[in-house]
From Swiss-Prot:
Domain of life: Bacteria
Disulfide bonds: none
This protein's name: Phycocyanobilin:ferredoxin oxidoreductase
Species of provenance: Synechococcus sp. (strain CC9605)
Catalytic activities: (2R,3Z)-phycocyanobilin + 4 oxidized [2Fe-2S]-[ferredoxin] = biliverdin IXalpha + 4 reduced [2Fe-2S]-[ferredoxin] + 4 H(+)
GO BP terms, alphabetized: phytochromobilin biosynthetic process
Gene Ontology terms for molecular function: cobalt ion binding; phycocyanobilin:ferredoxin oxidoreductase activity
Top enzyme category: oxidoreductase
Matches recorded under HAMAP family: Ferredoxin_bilin_red (MF_00618)
Length: 247
């Protein structure tokens, strides 16, 4: 199935628009791609935060090898824009977690991150070689990871504040490269048994990834302020970082 591309809303930041297009293009060629069922009230959300309109749109798919592909684009008034995407693997497959986030405001991009995060001890060697096949851009403002992020991201994570349009373009190209490596790995992957020790370890690794991501208090505080604590918990636990199904 080929998902229908969405038209970008007026005033969307060029990097948000470019990354969303790259992500949609990358998942369009994955095997067995289909829409992932989701409560309709979580697909598109509208609220108020500090007197400004808050809108959140979610696109959710699954395919062979990946239990969930998620793209979230959020906007607060005419200022803050957020893109968040995570591809969660089926633990039966030896695949990493793809993740990318950007935060854009009137002054530009304040944060941009992309990673292929291992769910076992380390990334597969072949995957590392593919990532390293593209030279790493010389970004001028590399940011420090929060403690919870250091516990789950790989040593190939890129977390920066892009300095100008040239670095925004370089980051977009880097994300496209990570997406290509991820998509190739998904197509090539074969499943292992539920009882295999490697499968169990990947399952536990993904549980830990979700646990650490839920420690990002900034996300929870924004959602609680715009809606309420119960809704924020539901959104985070059921949509953003839901645990993988039991083996």
């Amino acid at each position: 199935m080929q998902p229908k591309p969405l038209a970008p809303p007026p005033g969307q930041h060029p990097l948000v628009q470019a990354l969303a297009a790259s992500i949609r293009s990358a998942w369009a060629g994955l095997p067995g791609l289909e829409i992932l069922p989701c409560d309709e009230d979580l697909r598109f959300i509208q609220g108020q935060l500090d007197g400004e309109g808050l809108s959140i749109g979610n696109e959710l798919f699954r395919c062979i090898g990946l239990r969930k592909l998620h793209l979230e684009v959020a906007r607060l008034g005419n200022g803050l824009q957020i893109l968040h995407s995570v591809w969660f693997p089926d633990p039966h497959y030896d695949l990493p977690i793809f993740g990318a986030d950007i935060v854009a405001g009137p002054a530009g991009i304040s944060a941009a991150i992309v990673d292929l995060s291992p769910t076992s001890d380390a990334l597969p060697e072949q995957l590392i070689q593919r990532l390293e096949a593209r030279p790493w851009p010389a970004f001028r403002q590399v940011r420090e990871l929060p403690a919870w992020g250091s516990a789950i991201f790989s040593n190939k994570v890129c977390f920066i504040r892009p300095d100008g349009a040239d670095e925004e373009a370089a980051f977009q190209q880097l994300v496209s490269h990570y997406l290509q490596v991820m998509a190739t790995s998904v197509i090539e992957a074969t499943p292992e048994q539920s009882t295999a020790l490697t499968t169990v370890r990947r399952y536990e690794g993904q549980l830990n990834y979700c646990l650490q991501q839920k420690r990002n208090d900034k996300t929870r505080r924004v959602l609680e302020k715009a809606f309420d604590s119960a809704w924020a918990d539901r959104y985070i636990d059921m949509l953003l970082f839901d645990n993988p199904p039991e083996l």
